[in-house]
């Protein structure tokens, strides 16, 4: 794969696998492209929540809105321009605030095969 620039318009968002919440994801780079990482966008509707144990290392960049990420009694809240790192094996709960959120993410290795 050659160098590329992406925008949210390039992402084909779909409901996050295995989640009941109104959270959508869209991979732009993944295992189909031959690289070691997944890059994509996530959209969280207002007031949504998901809990999972991270199957991969995940870097989430908040582009719009606000999210709170909780683990082991600690909570961080991130807004536009802020980054949350969630290491593999960490049990997290991600909650969107009343305005919802748009994020970009990078995972290592690819997250989709790790969830199957």
Language model feature labels by segment:
Residues 1-40:
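A short, N-terminal "cap"/entry segment at the start of jelly-roll beta-barrel domains
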Residues 37-39, 57, 101-103:
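Structural motif
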Residues 38-54, 88:
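Conserved short histidine dyad/triad with adjacent acidic residue
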Residues 43-44, 53-69:
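Short, conserved beta-strand element in jelly-roll/cupin
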Residues 70-74, 97:
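Short strand-coil-strand connectors
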Residues 73-88:
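Short acidic-glycine-tyrosine-enriched beta hairpin
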Residues 88-114:
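Ligand-binding loop in jelly-roll beta-barrel domains
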């Amino acid at each position: 794969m050659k160098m590329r620039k992406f925008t949210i318009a390039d992402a084909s968002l779909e409901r996050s696998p295995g989640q009941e919440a109104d959270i959508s994801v869209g991979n732009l780079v993944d295992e189909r492209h031959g690289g070691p990482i997944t890059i994509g966008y996530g959209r969280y509707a207002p007031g949504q929540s998901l809990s999972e144990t991270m199957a991969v290392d995940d870097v989430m960049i908040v582009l719009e809105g606000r999210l709170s990420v909780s683990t082991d009694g600690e909570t961080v809240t991130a807004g536009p321009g802020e980054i949350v790192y969630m290491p593999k094996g960490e049990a997290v709960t991600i909650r969107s605030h009343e305005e919802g959120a748009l994020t970009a993410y990078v995972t290592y290795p690819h997250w989709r095969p790790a969830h199957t």
